[in-house]
Structure formats: C-alpha cells, structure tokens
Amino acid sequence: MATRHLSTQPAEQHHRRRFLDAALAVLTDRGVAGLTVRGVAERAGASTITVYTRFGGRVGLLDALYERAFDLLREDLQAVPPETDDGIADLLEVAQAYRRFAMASPARYGLMFERSVHDYDPDPALRAGVVATTFVEFVTKINRVSPPGVSARDCAYLLWTSMHGLVSVELTIRSQSHIEDWFLDPTAEAHGRMYRHGVLAMITGLGLRN
C-alpha cells in the first residue's frame, strides 16, 4: 500500500520543514491535544487551508510528522562518535543516544511508539520505511559484535525492545509523583545508570562481544 504521506518537490522542502517544525513545537508544548491542523497552522503563522494544501489534511500532516520524527532519531543515532576498536562501547553509545532522544521530547517519542494519537494509525508502508532506514543503525553496530551464526537482526530487535521498555517505564515514572521505597531514586542520573546497566545486561545475555 502506498503511504498517505504526500511527496514534494525540492523547492518546497523549506516550507514543508517550517510546518513540521511548527507541528513538533506544538506537540512538545501542548501535547497531543494541541496537535490539530488549526494549532499547527497558527504556530507556523499560516492558514489552515495552507496546511491542507501541503499535506492533504490531518492524517497527511501526522504521517509527515511521524516520518520527520524518525528522521530526527536517525540523525541523532548517526551523530554518535565514529566507530572505534571497541564495538561494544560503540553499540552502547548508540543506545545512549536513543535514550537521550526519547528524554528530549516524550511527546514526540509517544507519537512514534506509543500510539498516543488514539485515532491515528501510520500507514504500513510508511512504518516499514522508517523502520528500515532507522533501525539499520542498530543492526550495523550489532553486526560487528555478533557471534558466528547469530542473527544480527534478531539481536537488534531484542536489544531495542529492552531499550524501549526501559525508556517507556522511565518516562512513565518521571511523569508521575514519586512514591517512597521505589526501586531507584527519581533522578535522571539514577535512571541513566539503570538504563546503562540494563542495556549492558542484554548485550551480555545475547553473547555479543568484541
């Protein structure tokens, strides 16, 4: 199935980015409730008809925003330091970049992974495309440290689900009032240490090594 995401010519990219930046700002500042065509148009200083013209409506705008969010994640993963002789350390750097991305904008992360917009279901072809271009970063790093005969794709999936679980729980905990006698202190540093410990435990359990 073709995506609902509307393609544009290169000359339109600047205007398109302006609307997507506005949509990301609305999502961060006002949450999902503010993510309407009118809200995005107002933030971009444009009319609602302009948004409809460029994206075909709310679903087209959400598709484009969904795709843009994954573009930003991929850029962050690609921005980690160049590969070193320590493949495990390099993999851990990518995992840390993933957590930083999630913490930078929980609302954006929710749009990507948590179905936070209850009536929005990204087009399957669009989902397949963003997954293929983003999670290849994990597969590439894992390929360097996978034992012979072990599927790097399987390892990447298991590692990502662990990372996603840790991040999702952290976001939930940090959005709520702290309770006494919880497993760890309610600080970013404590959560960061637990995340690193969990990722390393999964790496070890998968038998990944330099």
What do these predicted regions represent?
Residues H15-A23, V40, L65-A69, L73, ...:
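Generic hydrophobic, amphipathic alpha-helix propensity
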Residues L27, L62-A69, M112, R127, ...:
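Alpha-helical DNA-contacting segments of helix-turn-helix folds
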Residues M1-H14, A25, T84, H178, ...:
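N-terminal intrinsically disordered/low-complexity leader segments
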Residues Y120-P147, R153-Y157, E189-I203:
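Amphipathic alpha-helical packing segments from all-alpha helical-bundle domains
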Residues M103-P122, S168-I179:
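Amphipathic alpha-helical segments used for helix-helix packing
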Residues A64, Q78-R108, V131-F135, G149-L159:
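Hydrophobic alpha-helical connector segments
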Residues W160-W182, A201-N210:
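Amphipathic C-terminal alpha-helical segment
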Residues R18, V26-G60, A64:
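Helix-turn-helix
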